[in-house]
């Protein structure tokens, strides 16, 4: 509904439960068109760290891109933007605009700058693929802190660490487009011109002239993982007799 009302594309993270897997959750990104149609979903391939206690990993079938009027869209969730093989899989499908969404992590180790780490991943993907990367990261609000204080007395101390979140847009040269947000909830505005992706590719097009696919061969299993595969079809007596009759007629 929000996509239709605002005539925009939406990429949003959700908790997804499969219709037949009632005890399994996936960390899923949905891509939604301006008409409100779900273009596709991407299930995070590997839950990060403690996420493994709650979410399961997706399969290769959701490593897809979507050809739209604003460019070829692709998305990865949070820490999997560190995975060069997953990122290259999207690049190789012609990705032009990449959406990377993250959680704010104020509880990261003191020597780990989460905001810089998020931005660095986006800069790397944009510079390597000569594409735009849109980064959206949640932030810990005062409302969240107050709610957590009901259960954890020192929640404010734990959740107010600086540089725990970054949102912004990275251009195909690896630089920030416009202004970014650090530790704040808000809206980032930036103008994207896909023509800017062309000139840098004349120098380094890792999908074409600047690669050696006679040497490197990346193979991706896009098979949907299912809990059951029927090897042999089961026939009823009537269907078996019918198949025999058909076979005899063909022999005649």
Spans of model-derived segments:
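CN hydrolase (nitrilase-like) catalytic-core segments centered on the catalytic cysteine
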Residues: 1-11, 72, 78-191
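Short, solvent-exposed loop/turn segments at conserved positions within beta-propeller repeat blades
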Residues: 21-25, 160-163
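Active-site-proximal beta-strand elements of phosphoester/diester hydrolases
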Residues: 28, 41-43, 65, 71-80, ...
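Short, acidic, Ser/Thr-enriched surface-loop or helix-capping motifs
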Residues: 31-34, 170-171
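Active-site glycine-rich loop that binds ribose-phosphate moieties when present
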Residues: 48-64, 81-85
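C-terminal beta-strand edge segments of enzyme domains
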Residues: 137-252
């Amino acid at each position: 509904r929000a996509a239709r009302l605002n005539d925009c594309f939406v990429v949003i993270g959700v908790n997804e439960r499969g219709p037949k897997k009632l005890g399994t959750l996936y960390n899923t990104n949905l891509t939604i068109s301006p008409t409100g149609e779900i273009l596709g979903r991407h299930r995070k391939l590997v839950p990060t760290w403690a996420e493994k206690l709650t979410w399961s990993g997706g399969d290769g079938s959701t490593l897809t891109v979507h050809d739209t009027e604003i460019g070829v869209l692709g998305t990865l969730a949070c820490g999997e933007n560190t995975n060069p093989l997953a990122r290259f899989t999207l690049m190789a499908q012609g990705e032009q605009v990449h959406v990377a969404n993250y959680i704010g992590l104020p509880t990261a180790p003191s020597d780990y700058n989460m905001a810089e780490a998020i931005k660095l991943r986006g800069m790397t993907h944009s510079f390597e693929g000569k594409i735009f990367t849109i980064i959206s990261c949640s932030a810990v609000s005062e409302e969240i802190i107050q709610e957590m204080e009901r259960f954890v007395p020192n929640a404010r101390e734990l959740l107010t660490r600086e540089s725990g979140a970054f949102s912004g847009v990275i251009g195909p040269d690896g630089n920030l487009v416009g202004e970014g947000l650090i530790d704040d909830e808000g809206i980032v505005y930036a103008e994207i011109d896909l023509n800017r992706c062309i000139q840098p590719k004349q120098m380094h097009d890792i999908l074409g002239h600047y690669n050696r696919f006679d040497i490197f061969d990346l193979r991706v299993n896009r098979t949907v993982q299912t809990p059951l595969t029927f090897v042999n079809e089961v026939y009823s007596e009537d269907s078996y007799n019918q198949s025999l009759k058909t076979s005899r007629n063909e022999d005649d």
